[in-house]
A protein has these predicted regions:
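Loop/turn-rich, solvent-exposed surfaces of beta-rich toroidal or solenoidal domains
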Residues: 225, 342-344, 373-431
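Residue position within the beta-strands of beta-propeller blades
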Residues: 2, 52, 96-97, 167, ...
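Extracytoplasmic beta-rich repeat domains
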Residues: 19-44, 69-87, 104, 125-157, ...
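Blade-level signature of beta-propeller repeat domains, shared across WD40, Kelch, NHL, RCC1
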Residues: 444-471
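Structural signal for beta-propeller blades
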Residues: 9-10, 59, 110, 191, ...
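A detector of repeated loop/turn-to-beta-strand junctions in beta-rich toroidal repeat architectures
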Residues: 6, 56, 106-109, 187-188, ...
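Short coil/turn segments that connect the beta-strands within blades of beta-propeller domains
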Residues: 47-48, 92-94, 161-163, 233-234, ...
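Beta-propeller blade signature
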Residues: 62, 66, 108-120, 181-199, ...
Length: 471
């Protein structure tokens, strides 16, 4: 099953590639308020149905064999800034999804619907309201929390044994203006666990307090079991734009590998947090700038968490375009390796204004701007050993890494390149074994399946406008 960036859904024959059926999304023709490109990150499958999220805020259920629309619900209104870009999760008769739109001033949420008829079952707000856990991490003298972001870009993961779902959240809003939202701004830039049946909060871990850099957590969480410190632990890993892997106990939310709170540089006009979490182990991407670009002066050596304010740009690395972004990571349960596609991209940050006003619904709500620093922008593909949070290997590419990866039991890991190459690497060493040029940007994750005793690899290549890959 394939879904396009415009939400048309196709069923293809695994034997011939022929189209068996197709569903036209018929998006609202007035649709305008989309952040970060027309895209869909897949469909959900369960109970003989395909579940697809639409950019205009609908969820539709289709017959898996026929493509016939079985039900459709308006889960959120695009006119208010919401869109649906993740693949819905089917679990135990429910369809569970998050929503995009933090850059357009929405209040993040996750919803569960009945898979039979689309009836709403529960809602969890990722920005807590008055009287809810975490509301005190937002200002009490304004209503900025109502537009606080923390949207959920990717499909939640589920542990059926524990009955929990897990997801990571986006930036607080406005993105680059901390002056109007003093506090840690929960549950933005966080990993959150909920009870799947009820949506009840279980635990959270915040990766970035009071984020002013758009260092959110768009990469989907990965669940794993591994021996750490002499016993098998139920683990969870998430790789942020910070360039770190955050490795937690998925039962409790506590770090499995140490994470220290360290003091960071301060800028009172941005109400910056006093400390930030620093995971022990290796960063996947550089977190400082070696040499200032011509015509620029570096503040704090351009290190991660360097604050900024006003119209004079401040260079810091990584930027919101660096670290790990939307393309999903993959996990090898034999080697205990997490394979991560990331980018080494520094940014030039501008923002922070106490007089910032909330724009009307559906308009961009960022409170600043970040451009590319005049430095090389390169890609990194790496293997992280989840038992130690250290790099097993890492390779740098001349172009940004923007592709989901696939780990296989045969000791191969597959990843795409922006110029259209599908690359097979040795899982142990990262050495390239073979490549195939697909003709368009290989940005979607590769899929594998077995048919008649033979294993196949399927690659969807179409390019990506946001990253500027071949189309």
């Amino acid at each position: 099953y394939v879904i396009t960036g415009a939400d048309d859904v196709f069923a293809l024959s695994v034997d011939t590639g022929a189209i068996l059926w197709q569903y036209a999304a018929k998006l609202d023709p007035g649709l305008t308020s989309i952040c970060c490109g027309w895209t869909s990150r897949g469909v959900g499958l369960g109970d003989g149905k395909i579940f697809a999220g639409m950019l205009d805020g609908r969820i539709v259920a289709l017959g898996a064999r026929t493509g016939k629309e079985l039900w459709s619900v308006q889960a959120e209104r695009w006119q208010e800034g919401f869109s649906l870009t993740c693949a819905p999760l089917y679990y135990d008769g429910m369809v569970i999804t998050g929503f995009s739109g933090a850059e357009i001033g929405v209040r993040g949420r996750v919803k569960a619907f009945d898979a039979d008829d689309g009836k709403l079952l529960w809602t969890f707000y990722t920005i807590p309201g008055p009287g809810e856990r975490g509301h005190d991490s937002w200002p009490q003298d304004n209503e900025v929390w109502m537009h606080g972001g923390a949207t959920v870009w990717h499909t939640p993961a589920v542990d059926p044994e524990l009955g929990l779902i897990y997801f990571s959240t986006g930036n607080p809003g406005p993105d680059f203006n901390g002056a109007v939202r003093a506090g840690d701004n929960l549950f933005s830039a966080s990993i959150v666990a909920l009870e799947a049946r009820t949506g009840k909060y279980r635990w959270h871990f915040q990766e970035v307090h009071h984020d002013i850099w758009d260092y959110d957590a768009p990469n989907p969480v990965v669940l794993f079991d591994a021996e750490i410190d002499g016993r098998v632990r139920k683990g969870l890993a998430q790789v942020g734009k910070t360039g770190w892997a955050y490795i937690l106990d998925r039962e409790t939310g506590k770090p499995l590998i140490g994470i220290d709170e360290r003091p960071v540089p301060q800028e009172p006009r941005q109400a910056t947090a006093a400390t930030q979490p620093y995971p022990k182990g290796d960063a996947i991407v550089p977190q400082h700038v070696e040499i200032a670009p011509e015509g620029y002066e570096l503040v704090n050596q351009g290190r991660i968490f360097t604050p900024f304010v006003g119209d004079k740009g401040v260079i810091a690395s990584p930027s919101l375009y660096g670290g790990a972004n939307w393309p999903p990571s993959s996990y090898d349960p034999v080697r205990r390796f997490l394979f991560v596609c990331a980018s080494d991209v520094a940014g030039n940050f501008i923002g922070g204004d106490r007089d910032f006003t909330i724009p009307p619904d559906g308009q961009h709500y960022e409170g600043g701007v970040v451009g590319f620093a005049p430095l090389p922008r390169t890609g990194i593909f790496a293997a992280v050993d989840v038992r130690t949070n250290t790099l097993a290997w890492r390779y740098r590419w001349p172009d940004q890494c923007y592709s989901g990866s696939l780990a296989t039991a045969g000791g191969l890991v597959f990843v795409g390149r922006n110029d259209g190459r599908l690359t097979a690497l040795d899982s142990d060493s990262g050495l390239k074994l073979w490549e195939f040029h697909t003709g368009a940007g290989m940005n979607a994750p590769t899929t594998t399946f077995e048919r008649d005793g033979k294993q196949y690899v399927v690659a969807l290549s179409a390019g990506n406008l946001l990253i500027g890959s071949a189309r």
